[in-house]
Amino acid sequence: MDSGKDTNGYERVWETNCGAMNSGLIMWVISGSGSFSDHYERDPTGGITFTVTNPGTSKRVITVGAFASRPLDTQSFYNAGRIAYFSSRGPTRNGRIKPNIVAGGYFICSTNSEFSSHSDPYICAEGHYYVPFAGTSMATAVVMGLVALYLQDHSFAIPEEVKEWFSSNAVEDDNFLYPNVVYCSEKAVYVLETRFKGSGKTSEQKLRRVTFSYRLAEMGL
């Protein structure tokens, strides 16, 4: 299906996703990367509204956008902490809030292919094993990891419970109103709490909460 087509989420891909969600499978999709959407060029602070496309508009999946989390050059990186320029903005065409969450995705250090000629050992680590990447695909991996950590302690959680877990642990940004259609559920991070078992001193780090916030950007919504 054309990922650049205007949709409200009620397409065949949406039906497939919902079928998977009904069977208990938790699904997440990226919230679009690229310079154009529906012939509109995106601006440096995250594009324009109504640019989340199918399957990101699906009703029950977790749609993930990206924010600028790791500047490569702090002297010239003006977008740190804000929505990434390539990350699509909501809402859907029928007014639903999307994306559901944004996570760090600009830049993220990730593993490098042995066949890749690209490397930057001064940013991530020595050698050619890790390289910086940017994209909503990187942010989606962050959220996927958080969901996996949650499911370790809640093996039988249904998709709605996982989404509620994110929402109930939201930490709002003092400078914005909530909810909104840009950052939506903004910065997804996790906090670890050290707990002790019995009388021993062996500590166990457990996922305590996921924190993210809703933001209202300069669009009057």
UniProtKB/Swiss-Prot annotation:
One of its GO terms (biological process) is proteolysis. InterPro entries: Peptidase_S8/S53_dom, Peptidase_S8/S53_dom_sf, Peptidase_S8_subtilisin-like. This is Uncharacterized protein aq_aa18. Coiled coil: none annotated. It comes from Aquifex aeolicus (strain VF5). Belongs to the peptidase S8 family. It comes from the Bacteria. Signal peptide: none annotated. Residues 1-189 form the Peptidase S8 domain. Keywords: Plasmid.
